Amino acid sequence: MIALCACVLLSSGCQLAGGMAEAYRRNSTRPIDAEYEGLAGKTFAVVASADRAIQSEHPQLVEETMRRASKVLSNSANVPKASGFVDADEVIRYTYRVPSWPARDALTIAEDLGGVQRLIHIEILEYRLNEPGNTYEWAGIAAGTVSVYEIDGNDPNTPAFTTTFNVDFPDAKGFGPDQLPRSGVTTALLLRMIDRSTWPMFRHEEPYYPEY
């Protein structure tokens, strides 16, 4: 009988400890190492692109992507840490001055931007806030690719690292303009896109159970 009680107490204790650990995970983050460490000690520039349909619907998207991604990747606390970068506004001016830049190879673009050692291209392939034809409910999606070119490497015009991103917002159905303003949905979706497009390049914290 004593042995049986001890087993029951032990089992209850294990269940309690397991429940506490699970509760901790649900409200905590864990460190994730960089997938790509090639920014260490290098200079970089971020360019972003999207097709005309996306840019027509979201005129500031490409510029905001370059600004926000550059800010995240230039953080002095990043590990690995870049040695320098081209300011996003300078890159934006370049894209206006040379509208045909997407047709140029990575080496040429990098040289045009002052000879940076890493060129990061964020290509936005899909970006929408609603299902087509449904303006009453938010169903935001942002998807695309990230390519990093090592300009000082042996093959500067072939990506040394590539990754994809695919995020959505809101996390549940049933939210429309009456519940969430368009500006809030746009900002949340953009921030998620920036996280997923930049996180692979530095050590960062992610929730144990990420929402995106």
What do these predicted regions represent?
Residues 60-61, 135-138:
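Short, glycine/charged-enriched secondary-structure capping and boundary segments
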Residues 2-12:
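Bacterial N-terminal signal peptides
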Residues 129-135:
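Extracytoplasmic/secreted cell-surface and envelope-processing proteins
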